[in-house]
């Protein structure tokens, strides 16, 4: 019996031993860090020997640098979006432009030289190379005009760029350890780090911190392997911030747009001014883009300017892109040669008519490419204006999702004044509503203040309103629920202040304050049609002028002379001195 039990006991013992060994092995495997390393070429997504990864402010970019003849080149779109939006690439004429506070700097594709206004400089190797859909710019050239630093590393090739000079959480490594792809000892190793290596902490976890090494590797490291983090302010001692100067007035701007449609209408300026109070800037609508070569048409008058000057009123001629609908303004602005012609024409007009200022009113600008070209136009024009003591103001819509490409901050660097067109909240073809409700204008001012200094903002205000006509789409239906405007044909017509008031009187309608819009509102019915109007009057005007006063804006502008009730000027001079 004992002889039979012995083999069974041995087998059982062996099984137990194997189980114990397996358990110990599993425990060892569980708590033993993997030595597997990550392929850094794959990690940085490098597919060819002439590529280099780009790590910008501790984030891996989707863009890649190109190594050409041992020089580092980066895509124009990357430069514009991530490093310095003031670089402007004209893909039509293959020229790279950069505008400083005082100079226009240009470099032609494949050229070693660049011009700073009239001086030519040698860069030593090609500055920019055109590609099928963009351009490649030498990173050293970008650095020359940008608040950035960069270092290059090998195995694999990568460029680590710093462009944001904020506080970071920094630490040093306490003992040799590894940076891993993810937090956990089983995650592959990205890089071995040594005692006293410097690390930037991007995010702190319970046991693992997300970090960036000085050579651009971003991964995870055990928290206990790091010293206590401390705040470190990044600085770039080699970069000197530009100083922008502006031609600004030491008084409130009270600007009135004077719509002039013929040469003969200029002779009426004495009567026009005599019906106002407090105006110190007149902006006549004299000039417009007239062809695709950048030439202007004008109906200006030296006598008009002389009369305004005799009354102590400056003249800021308005230049627009609206009158000649056959002209492709986008074409003019996206070609450097035609844009330059336009700027020269504007300056020639300013000299010829002795204008004190230039007011740019280019509208219907859509898309980033057109928007970038428009801002470049403002930069280049500003230099010419300032060199000749001429004030530059630019009319812009209120900030909205459809015009995010407008870099109002950079526009304000160059232009002296940014004029918010605080009207057309509702417009021909839209649903019925206020032309300029007080909450909408308030939001527009607040949004603009995030990008533009208060003393450079002029708030544009309407002297006009729209009367809306709502007709049921079924002829025999009466007007009932007008909240759902899809059931109605909506039309509108522009009215001056007095003409709108006359419509109320004719239709026995009474206006009352509408709390939502902050304006006086009236409605009436004729047959099966409903008419609505949000009035422009002293009530709405005073609320906007109070916005100017409360926010210490540079002043106000009014569209347009002749549409106002005469009483508004007493309200205006209460706020604009």
Regions found by a protein language model. Name each.
Residues 2-205, 235-249:
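Primary recognition of N-terminal secretory signal peptides and signal-anchoring hydrophobic helices
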Residues 98, 196, 208-213, 221:
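SH3/SH3-like beta-barrel fold
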Residues 233-345:
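Glycan-recognition patch characteristic of GH18 chitinases/ENGases
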Residues 236-240, 465-544, 576:
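Glycan-binding loop/region signatures in secreted carbohydrate-active enzymes
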Residues 254-258, 279-284, 315-319, 358-360, ...:
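Hydrophobic faces of well-ordered beta-strands that scaffold small-molecule active sites
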Residues 261-276, 336-351, 400-408, 536-549:
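Short, acidic/polar
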Residues 286, 343-373, 417-431, 557:
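Active-site groove signature of glycoside hydrolases
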Residues 292-299, 344, 371-502:
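Substrate-binding surface in catalytic domains of secreted glycosidases
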């Amino acid at each position: 019996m004992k002889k039979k039990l012995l083999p069974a006991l041995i087998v059982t013992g062996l099984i137990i031993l194997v189980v114990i060994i397996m358990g110990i092995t599993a425990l060892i495997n569980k708590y033993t860090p993997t030595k597997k390393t990550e392929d850094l070429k794959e990690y940085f997504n490098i597919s060819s020997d002439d590529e280099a990864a780009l790590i910008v402010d501790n984030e891996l970019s989707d863009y890649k640098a190109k190594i050409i003849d041992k020089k580092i080149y980066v895509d124009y779109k990357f430069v514009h979006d991530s490093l310095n939006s003031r670089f402007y690439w004209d893909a039509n004429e293959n020229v790279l432009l950069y505008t400083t506070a005082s100079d226009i700097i240009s470099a032609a594709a494949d050229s070693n030289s660049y011009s700073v206004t009239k001086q030519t400089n040698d860069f030593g190797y090609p500055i920019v190379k055109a590609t099928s859909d963009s351009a490649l710019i030498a990173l050293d050239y970008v650095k020359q005009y940008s608040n950035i630093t960069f270092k290059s590393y090998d195995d694999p090739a990568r460029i680590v760029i710093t462009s944001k000079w904020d506080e970071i959480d920094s630490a040093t490594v306490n003992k040799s350890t590894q940076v891993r792809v993810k937090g956990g000892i089983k995650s592959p190793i990205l890089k071995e780090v040594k005692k006293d290596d410097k690390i930037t902490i991007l995010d702190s976890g319970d046991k693992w911190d997300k970090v960036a090494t000085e050579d651009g590797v971003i991964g995870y490291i055990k928290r206990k392997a790091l010293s206590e983090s401390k705040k470190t302010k990044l600085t770039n001692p080699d970069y000197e911030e530009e100083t922008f100067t502006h031609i600004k007035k030491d008084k409130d701007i009270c600007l009135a747009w004077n719509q002039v449609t013929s040469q003969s209408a200029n002779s009426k300026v004495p009567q026009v001014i005599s019906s106002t109070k407090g105006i110190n800037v007149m902006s006549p609508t004299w000039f417009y883009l007239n062809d695709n070569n950048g030439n202007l048409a004008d109906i200006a008058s030296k006598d008009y300017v002389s009369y305004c000057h005799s009354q102590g009123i400056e003249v800021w001629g308005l230049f627009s892109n609206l009158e000649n609908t056959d002209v492709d303004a986008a074409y003019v602005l996206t070609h450097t040669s035609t844009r330059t012609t336009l700027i020269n024409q504007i300056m020639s007009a300013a000299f010829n008519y002795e204008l004190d200022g230039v007011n740019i009113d280019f509208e219907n600008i859509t898309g980033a490419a057109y928007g970038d070209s428009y801002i470049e136009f403002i930069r280049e024009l500003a230099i010419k204006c300032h060199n000749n003591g001429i004030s530059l103001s630019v009319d812009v819509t209120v900030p909205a999702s459809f015009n995010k490409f407008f870099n109002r901050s950079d526009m304000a660097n160059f232009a002296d004044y940014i004029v918010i067109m605080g009207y057309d909240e509702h417009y021909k073809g839209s649903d019925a509503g206020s032309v300029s409700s007080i909450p909408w204008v308030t939001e527009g001012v607040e949004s603009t203040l995030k990008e533009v200094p208060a003393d450079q903002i002029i708030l544009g205000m309407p002297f006009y309103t729209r009367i809306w006509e709502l007709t049921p789409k079924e002829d025999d239906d009466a007007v009932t629920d007008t909240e759902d405007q899809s059931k109605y044909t909506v039309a509108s017509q522009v009215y001056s202040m007095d003409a709108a008031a006359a419509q109320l009187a004719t239709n026995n309608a009474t206006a009352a304050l509408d709390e939502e819009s902050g304006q006086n509102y009236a409605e009436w019915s004729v047959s099966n049609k409903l008419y609505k109007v949000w009035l422009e009057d002293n009530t709405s005007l005073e609320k906007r002028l109070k916005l100017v006063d409360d926010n210490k804006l540079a002043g106000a502008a009014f569209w347009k002379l002749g549409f106002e009730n005469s009483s508004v000027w007493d309200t205006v001079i209460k706020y604009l001195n």
